[in-house]
UniProtKB/Swiss-Prot annotation:
Tagged with keyword Cytoplasm: yes
NCBIfam families, A to Z: frr
UniProt superkingdom: Bacteria
Higher taxonomy: Bacteria, Pseudomonadati, Pseudomonadota, Betaproteobacteria, Nitrosomonadales
Name under which the protein is recorded: Ribosome-recycling factor
UniProt gene name: frr
Gene Ontology MF: a single term: ribosomal large subunit binding
Organism: Nitrosomonas eutropha (strain DSM 101675 / C91 / Nm57)
């Protein structure tokens, strides 16, 4: 019973950490990468469609992402979706490709992105603490129903606290790395 609670707790914390990594990958840093456009959906014949399902996304050069639509009719819709995203990008059609030049980040934009990243990290920390609280509540129920002894409960709570500390430290490490990436000129 205790092992199941610990395992479920660790799985939930890992999912929260993975979600944070995905959120961080959506935040634009100075360097372009193909995953930057993954969260953009295109209104394709009235259906919101992820950009990856409509086009091949590549790095054209060190400062440009290239989007090559499979359906030539999707050019304008893809361009509009990228322009309307909150990333401050200005795509251009160039032959068979939509070129998305990555302008250098201004100091003000870097600070805004840092605030966003810190907020996402804090949300992940709160999620970790809520998962810990839920696990401790389950342990208290087992103790109340006399299915485990007090010392087992205390040991399990200590283990869950160590798990929480480990995952929160991982969140802090990811946050530090992302902040350093954002502030690098």
């Amino acid at each position: 019973m205790i092992a199941d609670i610990k395992k479920a707790t660790e799985q939930k914390m890992q999912k929260s950490l993975d979600a944070l990594k995905v959120d961080f990958s959506k935040v634009r840093s100075g360097r372009p990468h193909t995953g930057l456009l993954d969260h953009i959906t295109v209104d394709y014949y009235g259906t919101p469609t992820p950009i990856r399902q409509l086009a091949n996304v590549t790095l054209a050069d060190a400062r440009t992402i290239g989007v090559i639509p499979w359906d030539k009719k999707a050019f304008s819709a893809i361009e509009k979706a990228i322009r309307d995203s909150d990333m401050g990008l200005n795509p251009m059609t160039a032959g068979e490709m939509v070129r998305v030049p990555m302008p250098p980040l201004t100091e003000e934009r870097r600070k805004d992105l840092t605030k966003i990243v810190r907020t996402e990290a804090e949300t992940a920390r709160i999620a970790m603490r809520n998962i810990r609280r839920d696990a401790n509540t389950q342990l208290k129920e087992l103790l109340k129903d006399k299915l485990i002894a007090e010392d087992e409960d205390r040991r399990a709570q200590d283990d869950i606290q160590k798990l929480t500390d480990r995952y929160i430290a991982e969140v802090d490490k990811l946050l530090q790395a992302k902040e350093a990436e954002l502030m690098a000129v």
